[in-house]
Structure formats: C-alpha cells, structure tokens
C-alpha cells in the first residue's frame, strides 16, 4: 500500500497512535485514504501535496463507493481527533 500512512488502509487505527499525531499529520493521513483511490482534491494544498507523490493518480471526483469498511471507520476516527 503506497503512502506515508499505509496502516490507515490496512487495519483499524488505535486511539493512542492518533493521539501522537499533529493536526497536519491527521489531515494528511485521512486524505491519503481518499488519494489512494484517485480522489481529485478541490483544495489546492491537498492537490499539490498528493500530486508530488509518485503513486497518486487523480481520476475520481467521488470515491466513497471505493472505500473499504476499515477505511471508513478510520476516516471517522481520525475526524474525531481533528477537532
């Protein structure tokens, strides 16, 4: 699995590992899940960040139907820590 945070796609994340991350790291981790499915970001900074990744292939404006149950649960958990 490509990216800086492959664990967000492979397994359920834990509270303790998310507590150790900064807001920016949490944001990148959450959006990396979408990027792996080729999501085309509307925010310039996210598009710029992921466009620098050799594995990123933007091709979808909606990837919700591509997300696994693990990814969906991790996105919701990460959002709780981004507040």
Task: Give the ranges of each region predicted by the language model.
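Conserved catalytic/binding loops enriched for acidic/polar residues
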Residues: 10, 15-16, 70-74
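N-terminal low-complexity, Pro/Thr/Ser-rich intrinsically disordered segments
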Residues: 1-13
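Compact alpha-helical subdomains of small soluble proteins
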Residues: 41-83
């Amino acid at each position: 699995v490509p990216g800086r945070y492959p664990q967000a796609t492979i397994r359920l994340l834990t509270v303790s590992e998310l507590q150790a991350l900064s807001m920016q790291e949490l944001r990148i981790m959450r959006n990396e899940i979408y990027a792996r499915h080729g999501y085309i970001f509307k925010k310039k900074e996210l598009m710029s960040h992921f466009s620098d990744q050799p594995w990123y292939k933007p091709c979808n404006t909606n990837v919700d139907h591509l997300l696994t149950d693990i990814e969906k649960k991790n996105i919701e958990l990460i959002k709780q820590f981004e507040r």
